[in-house]
């Protein structure tokens, strides 16, 4: 699936050992890109990276994204064509326990990316992944548009709003940053995610131990999207704006309205796939989390020719296959399944 645009492009991905970073880096390798990873050494969600043995595909340098010198030194060695910033403290609930680290990783880390491209020769384009939780959420069932106010009622969400504001401020302050695009995506699922307090990973962890999953907010609505959809959208954005000059924009990356679904429905679909009657218990959490989150993706869809999504049951079934192979400890089959699936997905794009 070598892609003419991506062939031999030098791409830095920060946070490459995490769930999304691992999938994205593998897709880019299969597309012909030269990938260079920068990641924190301690990562509790690097199982996909290890299972697919991605260290054999490209080199990862380990450092601290909240330390300017750590990333700047790495960047100067690579001199990338493209920079993708994904490194973050990615958990809402964890931000209550480690608020300062969340701010350091998500805000100062983003500032270090921007400062690095300011003081060095900038890449042609920098893609900064923030989150769909970057908006001020008043639970009004509205679909958030890119022009809506940024903010957050928890430290994680606020940190992503701050990262967006920083990107805009840097762009307006300096003229030598190349092209910068921020993308706001979230509730991404797929095989290989073992993150904390995430619905779908928790489901598979629980049923593998023959235990019920604990659901905090069964009626919460989220914009669920399969891992390869945002990745393909990220690639489309980079390809389109690569040759611009000092361009800035931001996009919501989200699914169609049919995939804005209640938490409990997701679990019931997975139970049906696994022929289970009821795998869950409901226990309310005391910690605050938005109940309703909906994204308006019309800005992106009006600019790009977007592949129509299959129904969410299809993607949950694919996700189920990945975890089934994982818990059967069939590593060779996981590798074959993942690579063949990526090739098939992009062939149909």
PLM region spans:
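Residue-level recognition of oxygen-bearing side chains
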Residues: 70, 101, 108, 199, ...
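Tryptophan-centered motif/residue detector
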Residues: 6, 23, 27, 48-49, ...
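Asparagine-centered polar/low-complexity signal
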Residues: 105-106, 112, 187, 217, ...
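N-terminal Rossmann-like NAD(P)+-binding domain of SDR-like oxidoreductases, especially those catalyzing
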Residues: 1-185, 337-341
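C-terminal substrate-binding subdomain of Rossmann-fold SDR/epimerase-dehydratase oxidoreductases
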Residues: 30-31, 63, 207-349
């Amino acid at each position: 699936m070598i892609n003419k645009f991506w062939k031999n492009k030098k791409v830095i991905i920060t946070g490459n050992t995490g769930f999304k970073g691992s999938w994205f880096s593998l897709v880019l390798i299969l597309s012909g890109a030269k990938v260079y990873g920068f990641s924190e050494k301690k990562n509790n969600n690097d199982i996909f990276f290890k299972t697919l043995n991605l260290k054999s595909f490209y080199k990862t340098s380990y450092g601290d994204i909240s330390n300017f010198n750590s990333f700047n030194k790495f960047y100067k060695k690579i001199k990338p064509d493209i920079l993708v910033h994904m490194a973050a403290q990615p958990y809402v609930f964890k931000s209550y326990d480690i608020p300062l680290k969340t701010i350091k990783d998500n805000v100062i880390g983003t500032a270090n990316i921007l400062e690095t491209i300011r003081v060095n020769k900038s890449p042609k384009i920098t893609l900064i992944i923030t989150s769909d939780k970057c908006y001020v959420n008043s639970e009004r069932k509205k679909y958030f548009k890119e022009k809506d106010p940024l903010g957050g009622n928890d430290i994680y969400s606020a940190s992503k709003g701050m990262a967006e504001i920083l990107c805009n401020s840097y762009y307006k302050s300096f003229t030598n940053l190349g092209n910068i695009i921020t993308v706001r995506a979230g509730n991404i699922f797929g095989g290989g995610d073992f993150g904390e307090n995430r619905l779908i990973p928790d489901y598979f962890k629980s049923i593998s131990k023959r235990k019920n999953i604990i659901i905090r907010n069964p009626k919460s609505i989220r914009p669920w999207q399969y891992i390869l959809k945002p990745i393909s959208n990220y690639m489309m954005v980079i390809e389109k704006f690569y040759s611009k000059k000092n361009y800035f924009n931001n996009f919501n990356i989200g699914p169609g309205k049919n995939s804005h679904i209640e938490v409990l429905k997701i679990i019931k679909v997975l139970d049906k796939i696994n022929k289970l009657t009821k795998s869950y218990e409901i226990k309310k959490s005391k910690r605050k989390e938005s109940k309703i989150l909906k994204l308006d993706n019309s800005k992106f869809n009006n600019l790009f020719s977007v592949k129509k999504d299959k129904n969410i049951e299809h993607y949950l079934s694919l996700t189920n296959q990945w975890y089934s192979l994982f818990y059967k400890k069939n590593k060779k089959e996981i590798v074959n399944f993942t690579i063949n699936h990526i090739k098939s997905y992009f062939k149909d794009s």
